């Protein structure tokens, strides 16, 4: 299992672009220095009325297949 941590700050306007279909993937830079690409549906459980803000931990299998995403703050 691999773990990657990153901060995410998406405003309500940015989330609306995602919901309107303008983006299917989200690209973030992990604190470990890697560029990570996530399907936007992985962040939906964390969307609030004002957007998505927080510190997250992405867990993947050794071949980088998704296991879980959790907010850790």
Each language-model region and where it sits:
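Amphipathic, hydrophobic secondary-structure cores in small proteins
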Residues: 16-53, 57-62
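Charged low-complexity stretches with an acidic bias
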Residues: 60-73
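Charged, amphipathic alpha-helical segments
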Residues: 1-13, 39-44
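Short acidic/polar alpha-helix capping motifs at helix-coil junctions
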Residues: 7-10, 18-22, 65-67
